[in-house]
Each structure stands twice: as C-alpha cells, then as structure tokens.
C-alpha cells in the first residue's frame, strides 16, 4: 500500500511518537514502542461526523501494509529515546548482527590515550570503543553528536539473555566475571538470571583499571569450557543510531564525548602550529603499555510486550481538524523532546528551563538564548560558512523578512520553535501531574502515589486568595475573583541563592479565568495581570526565605499513606453522619439507632466537633419547616 511521506514527527518526553503524513493520516506509537495506532485520513467528501478508520496492532506482529511506516517511526523514536525498542521481525537484515557473546557494556580508551580515534578531512572526530561495539562521531561544529552502538533486540518477558551482574560484585571480581558471560539464549535452564527489582534500564558511566577481552571464556579453576556455539546459542544484536545535543549529553556517552572534545582541541592546536599536519589520519598511542579504560553500560532494549499496556494513551483528532494538518501541532499532553518538521529538527532539553536547538539541515544551528529562553535565538553558521558569516542574534518580536534564494526561512523556523516552547510551558504549568507516569517506567510493586507530587505548603490570605505549593516545584494560587495562577518555583532550600527566582527564570506563568479560558503570561511583563503575578511571586519568595524545617521538601511514604487514609476515613464518616441525620432516607428506627450507635462508638468526639451537629440540625429543621409551608400554600391554591 502506498503511503504519503512524513510531514511532522514528534517525540515526547515519555518516548511516545506521533507521525503526521501529507495525506492527513497519523500514526501514534506507545511510549514503550510495543503498540501503535494508525488513523487513516478521511476523503474530502466524507460526512463531518463520520469517524476515520483506526488500526491498532502490536508492533511485533505488524502487517506488511504498515511495516515501512512503523519502521521509520521506530527509528525516529530510538534516535533520542532513553531505551530503544528493537523488534527483530521489522529490523532490516543489514542492521542485524549475530554474536556468540552476551554483552551490555563497552570499553573506551582512557583520556591519556588516542587509540581507536580517527578524524576526517571534514573535521569529524570518531571515537571507537576497544571492542568495536560502539563509536561516537563529533562534527567540527560541536553542537551535536551521533553515536552508533550494538544493542540486543527486544526479548519476550519469559526469555531474556544473561543480564549484567556487575552491580553486586567487587571491582576485582567484575573483570573475571565479565569474561564468563557467554550467551546461551537457546537454553535458559542452564543460566542463573539475576536482575534486581526496580533496576533502571541503563546505568551510569563506570571506570576500570584494565581492559578485558570479552570474547574469551576464562575460569580460574580451569573448569570453564566453551559451549557448543550452534545457531540456537547466538544472540541477535542490531545497530542503533542516536543523536544528542552536546549541551545535554547522557551519562553513558559523557566519557567518549569528552575524549572527542579533548582530541579535537589537540588536532586544532597542532594544525595551527604545523601547517603540514595531515588533514585525516589514525592516531595511535605513543605508549604501548596497558592503561586504564572507561566502561559505559549500553542502553538496554525494552521488552516486546509492555508491562502496563493499560497506561497507553491515544489521541483521536476531530474529523474537521484532521483536514487541516497545521491546526493543532501537539495534541498529546506531554513535554516535547524532538520534533522533525519538513526536514528541520528541533531538539529540546527540560532541566530547569525549556531550551531548544534548531538544526535546519545545512550544518548551522539556532539556539535559544537570553534570560527567558525563547525570546532570543543565536544563529551559528555551518563550519564551511563560518569564515564568511558571523554569529547573529534574533529577537522573537523583531524577526527579519524572508529573502529569496535562502536555504530556509528564519522567520518560520523561529516561529515554529516558539510554538513548541509555548506548548511545553503549558504542559509544565498544568495541574494534571500525570506527565511523569509512563508505562515502561512502572516497575512491579511501585505505587503511582509515590510518583505524584505532594502538597508542601498551603496558605489562606484574607482578602487575596488561597496559595498552594507542591513538591514538583509547582505553585498554584486561587484568587477570590476566580482567577487562578500557576507557575514553577524552586522550593528546595534557601541555600541555593542562584535559583531563588526560579519562577522568573522560567519566564512564564499560566492564568486561568473563571470562564475556563487560560493564557500564558510572561512573569517579567505581566501587563494588566501584574497584581496576580506579583502576589504569587511575593508569596514564593517568602517561602524560600523561611527555614528548611518550616517548608518540608518531601514526605515519607508512611506519612503520606497515613495522611491519605485518615483523610478518606474522615470524609466517609462525615458523609455517613450527614446522610443518617438528614432524613433523606426513610430508614426504620432500628436501623437508625444501630447506625447512629456505630458512628458514636467509632469517632463521635472528633466527628461532632468537626461538623458541628447543632448547626446542621438547625439548618435541617428550618429546611423542613420551609418545605411544610410550601406544601400548605400548594394545598390552599388547589382549593
């Protein structure tokens, strides 16, 4: 089946993907990658109320009609995902590799060595691991880098290879145990699988003092023998390509990236001194003796089946809006990580603030700059044009007009980036609190309540409104006129002077009006809403200036559990008391006495004090008298 080309591909923070095609069709990929939903475009003559055809399938069992589209969507996901999803059934044969060993980490040269380091005439530095299972490429611009590594394909939950066991071992035993890890994928009964619960799918960078050849089998007691390496014992690996920003490098690639940056500086310094320095070469170490190496644990592929498929969320577009591809760019309530739109890549980072980088495709890059990220963009030309063109800074409020013959439109690129930043600002200022819950992050035995934020501080200011602060640095204020303000503010402690005005550094706050409409307002220039923003910021500054003992940063799980149970029981007791004493239900006297006795025996003292029985009884008595008067008037009017 022929399919139109992709127009927009969006990767969200939970690693879910949305793909929009030129024909109007859409493809959604679950965060774990194990399931997808394809929504076909409706013809122009279709009735507006007719729903489009939707196909929902498991990724591992995709039919041939959607195989190519799903493969490109998975490649886009795996290029920037925390954990790749690699289904053996849809990976091309040229990207597969059968290996007789099971490995989950690679060794890199140390900082004082230049082994396995290459650079080309174009200025690209290539760092290759000692075992050849991964390599990193850093271009001369040094804004982003790509990494290629071998990753074991996704396995079924009941059959997986031997996992890394180096976490519970001594450093001396790690090197010996690493040489014993021979893959036996065909017979799991001969293995001893040990995997810690709640272990993250990837580990941080580790260091070792010596390199070990993982292709051999070693046993200090002389009892180790190579097993029969037949076809059933081979592990299937696939090459994965990822692209990351140098400013937001994952832990696993920090050492090879630092090695590439250090080596590039050496090459540039040598070329300035010696004009005859070769433009491309392979540089080896001057000292042949063995030296220390660095070990990175590779990202581990997710399972073929999702552990929590009930958490998959699908967005269904309106049939009228679906005919307008640019009507709604981001309908998924999640932070955006990467956007590919008509050949241009937008890469975002979400640490303390939302920052974005734009890669038009010609080697140049735009970066959001300024006190409020997103108000200014700095243009860095490509390396070939760096001698002719200088760096420029553009303001969002004063963009230059488009010039004929340019490779791209600066105005359209920055406007698109601004829309992405505004979407992320709305998500960060949302009170849904569910964007951190993800299906592949839900380990067995982990409660969702431990992930959701907790109320840290609540204040009721007379004549102003109610202010609340949560553990996820989110502040919510409800004013007496019905206007609500939400912003982010760092509440960890007053010792961090640099982040006292974290809400201001974010640059935006969200106002919700009584009619339900909301609007993003810059905190530095709120305009007509200055009194709302100023009141919230003043209250936040008062919180950061208090002692850490007065503002708790977190609650223990036991305290949170007791607090939630007590509050729910109190609500149930109040509801039961009001129901039994309001006379709404015509219960028998015996049942009323039994229920009232049960309530009194439970918590009569605290309950009567909380609800104030006398006021409730007086109000009910007056209500009954009014109803009797109404009945009398109705009876008299009928006569």
From Swiss-Prot:
Q: Which residues form the signal peptide?
A: none
Pfam families xrefs: C5orf34-like_N (PF15025), C5orf34_2nd (PF22833), C5orf34_C (PF15016), Polo_box_4 (PF22834)
Q: What is this protein called?
A: Uncharacterized protein C5orf34 homolog
Source organism per UniProt: Mus musculus
């Amino acid at each position: 089946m022929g399919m139109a080309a992709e127009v927009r591909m969006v990767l969200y923070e939970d690693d879910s993907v949305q793909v929009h095609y030129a024909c109007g069709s859409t493809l959604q990929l679950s965060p774990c990658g194990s399931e997808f939903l394809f929504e076909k475009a409706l013809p122009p003559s279709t009735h507006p109320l007719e729903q489009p055809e939707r196909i929902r399938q498991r990724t591992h069992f995709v039919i041939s009609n959607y195989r190519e589209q799903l493969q490109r969507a998975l490649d886009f996901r795996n290029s920037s995902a925390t954990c790749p999803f690699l289904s053996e059934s849809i990976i091309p044969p040229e990207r597969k590799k059968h290996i007789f060993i099971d490995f989950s980490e690679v060794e890199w040269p140390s900082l004082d060595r230049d082994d396995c380091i290459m650079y080309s005439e174009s200025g690209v530095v290539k760092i290759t691991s000692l075992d050849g299972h991964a390599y990193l490429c850093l271009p001369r611009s040094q804004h982003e880098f790509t990494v290629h590594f071998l990753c074991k394909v996704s396995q079924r939950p009941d059959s997986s290879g031997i996992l890394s066991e180096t976490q519970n071992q001594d450093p001396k035993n790690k090197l010996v145990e690493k040489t014993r890890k021979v893959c036996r994928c065909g017979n799991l009964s001969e293995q001893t699988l040990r995997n810690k619960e709640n272990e993250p799918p990837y580990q941080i960078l580790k260091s070792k003092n010596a390199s070990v050849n993982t292709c051999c089998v070693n046993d200090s007691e002389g009892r180790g023998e190579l097993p029969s390496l037949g076809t059933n014992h081979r592990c299937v690996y696939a090459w994965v390509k990822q692209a990351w920003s140098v400013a937001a490098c994952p832990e696993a690639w920090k050492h090879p990236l630092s090695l590439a940056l250090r080596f590039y500086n050496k090459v540039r310094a040598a070329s300035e001194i010696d004009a005859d320095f070769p433009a491309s070469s392979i540089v080896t170490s001057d000292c042949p003796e063995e030296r220390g190496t660095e070990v990175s644990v590779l990202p581990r592929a997710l399972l073929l089946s999702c552990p929590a498929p009930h958490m998959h969320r699908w967005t269904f577009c309106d049939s009228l809006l679906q005919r307008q591809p640019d009507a709604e760019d981001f309908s998924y309530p999640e932070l955006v990580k990467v956007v590919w739109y008509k050949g241009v890549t937008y890469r975002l980072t979400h640490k303390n603030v939302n920052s974005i980088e734009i890669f038009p495709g010609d080697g140049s890059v735009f970066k959001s700059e300024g006190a409020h990220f997103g108000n200014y963009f700095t243009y860095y030309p490509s390396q070939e044009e760096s001698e002719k063109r200088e760096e420029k800074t553009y303001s969002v409020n004063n963009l230059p007009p488009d010039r004929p013959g340019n490779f791209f439109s600066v105005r359209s690129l920055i406007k698109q980036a601004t829309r992405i930043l505004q979407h992320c600002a709305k998500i960060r200022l949302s009170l849904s609190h569910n964007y951190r819950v993800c299906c592949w992050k839900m380990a067995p035995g982990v409660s969702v309540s431990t992930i959701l934020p907790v109320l840290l501080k609540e204040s009721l200011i007379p004549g102003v409104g109610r202010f609340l602060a949560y553990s996820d640095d989110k502040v919510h204020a409800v004013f007496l006129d019905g206007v609500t303000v939400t912003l982010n503010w760092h509440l960890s402690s007053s010792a961090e002077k640099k982040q006292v005005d974290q809400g201001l550094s974010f640059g935006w706050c969200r106002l919700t009006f009584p009619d339900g409409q909301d609007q993003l307002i810059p905190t530095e220039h709120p305009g007509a809403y200055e009194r709302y923003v100023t009141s919230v910021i003043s209250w936040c500054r008062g919180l950061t200036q208090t002692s850490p003992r007065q503002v708790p940063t977190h609650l223990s799980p036991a305290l949170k559990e007791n607090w939630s149970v007590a509050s729910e029981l109190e609500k149930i007791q109040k509801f039961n008391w009001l129901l039994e004493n309001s006379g709404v239900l015509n219960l028998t006297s015996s049942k009323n006495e039994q229920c009232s006795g049960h309530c009194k025996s439970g918590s009569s003292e605290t309950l009567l004090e909380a609800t104030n029985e006398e006021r409730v009884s007086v109000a009910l008595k007056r209500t009954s008298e009014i109803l009797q008067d109404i009945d009398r008037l109705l009876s008299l009017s009928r006569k």
